[in-house]
Amino acid sequence: MIKKCSNKSIVIAGAGLTGLMSAIKLRQLYPDKEIIVFDRAHHVGGMYSSLSYSQSVMFDYGMHIIYESCNKEIDDLYTKVMPKSEWHMYENNEKDIAGLFFNGRLQTYSHYIDLRTFSQKDRNIFTGSLMHMLDKPDSKSPNNVMDFLRNQFGCEIADVVHRPILHRMYGIDPEDLDVFAIKATALERVVLFDSAIMLDLMKSSKLRERLAFPDQLNLPPIRTNNQKALYPRKFGMVHFVDRLRSYLESIDVDVLTETDIQHIRQQRGRIKQITLNSKKSGIKNIAVDRLLWTVGWPLLSKQLNLDISDLKFQKGPEIIFVNLSFNRPLLMERLYYFYCYDDGFATFRVTNYSNYCPGAAQDGWFPLCVELWPSKIGKKRTVMEINECIELAVDELKRFGVIGVDHKLIFAKVENDVSEFPMPSLENKKSLKVIRSRVEDLEIKNLTVAGIMASDDLFFIPDILNDAFSKLHSL
């Protein structure tokens, strides 16, 4: 039996953080409207949810801290949903303590590439390369990531240092990568000078855009905002996500999980009705006042019956989450996480949960997540056995120096079918632009698109939420 909603509803496709936070704002803007959020997953929050292996064993999907949007109407919602007393709040130099494994060394002082690890001869060449670029005008529209990096640092640094890293990470010619590739792991700066010299050099905006301070915990107060980082005091981002869902239900927002969209009916430039198929409640036809779409342009084009068979999409690196617990703290100093750029490693990132959530370490368990990109070592996740993933992660942790002979593995689980990292290629960006244009050509008056890549370079949640809330205000 098909159920039908008589009143027009505001419908939100996607129950990730964008969809859920937008639902709160829409309720504030439209107190009398029916609001429905749906998602095909069995849980809300997307990658901001958590994996629960038992009542006492939980892991996040790698590194997920909430960074404020520096927009009061957004940031106030976090403490509206969950009081300040239930959050860890980090600011200034403790907001994001990140590192990097590069040139065989774990950098606990900066996640930017440290060129001081090269020979003095190379460092002299790199310094000359960078200084030479300062006299040239900045490129306003670089063609690809290598154009940007050469303009930023000069050919000697871009081609010798960055090119092999980017090729190793994404498996395609870096000339075919969009500029956005530098933002995913912060490749826009390098460490080249010690702290004393940098204190003087930072007075120049051109140098500040290119050079990183080599001691993140003692970085001078030069930030232009007071952005904070938030994480629940109780380990597991799901604790916030669950509270968010409960809050939405308390303000009469319907949240439907395990629900697919079957059909969108358009008429005279408007979406009139959508058909949802819910595992719990069956098929439902919903009269639509407005549709907020947060789950990507390709899925939207499919639902709107647009032909995109002429477009190509390159798949990004496959991700394997290896969740481990050891019997003692990891040898990472204060790092929340670090990346790995070196050859011969499958690791993309290691996250040490107890460094930003002390409650994660309980009963002698110290949890961490190793995110493997098997393509970095020429493998596919489909052919990697569970034990192979665990052994690989543990071996690389030893090579990083993060665990020693006294560390005993007491828990291990592998998630090898969760996600892929978005490929920041020129081809993908071009295809998304074409889809966006084709959707916009339909001139659907009551459709709003938000979320990752809703517009160029939208990837991080603070930017995504600012973009979404701006669009909601203009409905």
Task: Cite the ranges covered by each PLM segment.
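N-terminal Rossmann-like FAD-binding beta1-loop-alpha1 element of flavoenzymes
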Residues: 2, 8-37
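Conserved Rossmann-like nucleotide-cofactor binding loop
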Residues: 18, 43, 298
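Dinucleotide-binding Rossmann-like beta1-alpha1 core, especially the glycine-rich loop
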Residues: 55-137, 187, 191
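Active-site/ligand-binding neighborhood in enzyme catalytic cores
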Residues: 127-262
